[in-house]
Swiss-Prot record:
Active-site residues, as the UniProt record annotates them: 248 (proton acceptor)
Catalytic activity, as annotated: a UDP-3-O-[(3R)-3-hydroxyacyl]-alpha-D-glucosamine + a (3R)-hydroxyacyl-[ACP] = a UDP-2-N,3-O-bis[(3R)-3-hydroxyacyl]-alpha-D-glucosamine + holo-[ACP] + H(+)
SUPFAM superfamilies cross-referenced by the UniProt entry: Trimeric LpxA-like enzymes (SSF51161)
Entry keyword Repeat: yes
Pathway: Bacterial outer membrane biogenesis; LPS lipid A biosynthesis
One term under GO cellular component: membrane
Gene name of the record: lpxD
Protein name: UDP-3-O-acylglucosamine N-acyltransferase
InterPro entries in UniProt: Hexapep, Hexapep_transf_CS, LpxD, Trimer_LpxA-like_sf, UDP_GlcNAc_AcTrfase_non-rep
Length: 349
């Protein structure tokens, strides 16, 4: 798929500004077939500037055009697509030029589908996928090769599942969702009762399910456990990165974003519009307010009742400095006692 610069300007609602040294009519007809970074872009490609630290690359880029904000136009040596939010412009153009192949096309003869499965119009199912009894697939659902869809699961309109995904029994997935390869939704939560007086555990059947809302995206190899009694819920507009673990009965509020390798323990409720960076650990049975941000590798151990940015942990330093700091931390208890003794002496004087 290719577009002229003039067509792209219309689709992005951007203003096309051509340098005086170039022919405006010819530039408007330039064919664009791809996107690239400022450093790597060439003829027929558009770059974008959304971070000022890359602005020096505007003078040397070989892109046919660059998406820029109004304050960067003068520094641009090639045609500029000017808009207030260049990063959104990049996202919109990427959608226009996206050449990702379809997950599957039609129903593969090697797919194993139970007789009573309800299949909507224009549904695709890849090779070696197994779909059990009672499943409902809405219109335009696409399921890749090697997937398993368990008994009674429901998948909403225009949802896409890539290869080797496991959807357990009774899981419900909304419409226009995108789930990447090797994700598992609806496996048993980590529920066990200790046997009194013995080092043994009695497994607790997980009787709830998982409910995924609409317009949810889930990355590769993420795992979402089914609820013990109530359901685990991932609400509308949530985006989840790769390799996230969400335990049983967790609720993730609308439009929350969670980055890779984050772990959320059971029965925690996360509010709307939160941003959780990578490798964050969230304790179980706590509640997090709307509009909270947690920086990478934070440990969330208690309720968060107010919106804001939260951090924990220590950024990396040279090993020598870390060893000194660690040694000082170990002496804090004795140091505190000495300070208290000195305060008592000063108080007497």
């Amino acid at each position: 798929m290719t577009y002229t610069l003039a067509e792209i300007a219309i689709k992005l609602d951007a203003k096309l500004i051509v340098p005086a040294a170039l022919d405006e009519q010819n530039e408007a007809l330039t064919q664009i077939s791809g996107l690239a970074t400022l450093a790597k872009a060439g003829t027929g490609q558009v770059a974008f500037l959304a971070n000022s630290k890359y602005q020096q690359q505007l003078s040397s880029t070989n892109a046919s055009a660059v998406i820029v904000s109004p304050d960067a136009v003068e520094a641009c040596q090639v045609s500029a697509l000017v808009m207030d939010n260049p990063y959104m412009g990049y996202a919109m153009l990427a959608s226009l030029l996206d050449s990702t192949p379809k997950v599957s096309c039609g129903i593969h003869p090697n797919a194993v589908i139970a007789d009573d499965v309800l299949i909507g119009e224009n549904v695709s199912v890849g090779a070696n996928t197994v779909i059990e009894s009672g499943v409902q697939l809405a219109d335009n659902v696409s399921i890749g090769a090697g997937c398993f869809i368990g008994h009674g699961a429901k998948i909403g309109e225009s949802t896409i599942l890539w290869a080797n995904i496991t959807i357990y029994h009774r899981v419900e997935i909304g419409h226009h969702c995108l789930i990447q390869a090797s994700t598992v939704i609806g496996s048993d939560g980590f529920g066990y009762a200790p046997v009194k007086g013995q080092y043994k555990w009695h497994k607790i059947p997980q009787l709830g399910s998982v409910i995924i809302g609409d317009h949810v995206e889930i990355g590769a190899s993420t795992t979402i456990d089914r609820g013990a009694l109530d359901n685990t819920e991932i609400r509308d507009g949530v985006i989840l990165d790769n390799q996230i673990q969400i335990a049983h009965n967790v609720i993730v509020g609308e439009n929350t974003a969670i980055a890779g390798c984050t772990v959320i323990a059971g029965s925690t409720v996360i509010g709307k519009n939160c941003t959780i960076a990578g490798l964050v650990g969230v304790n179980g049975h706590i509640t997090i307010a709307d509009n909270c941000v947690f920086t990478g590798m934070s440990m969330v151990t208690k309720n968060i009742s107010q919106a804001g940015v939260y951090s924990s942990g220590m950024p990396v330093v040279q090993n020598k400095e870390w060893n000194k700091t660690n040694a000082r931390v170990k002496r804090l208890d004795s140091l505190t006692k000495r300070v208290k003794e000195l305060e008592k002496l000063l108080a007497k004087n």
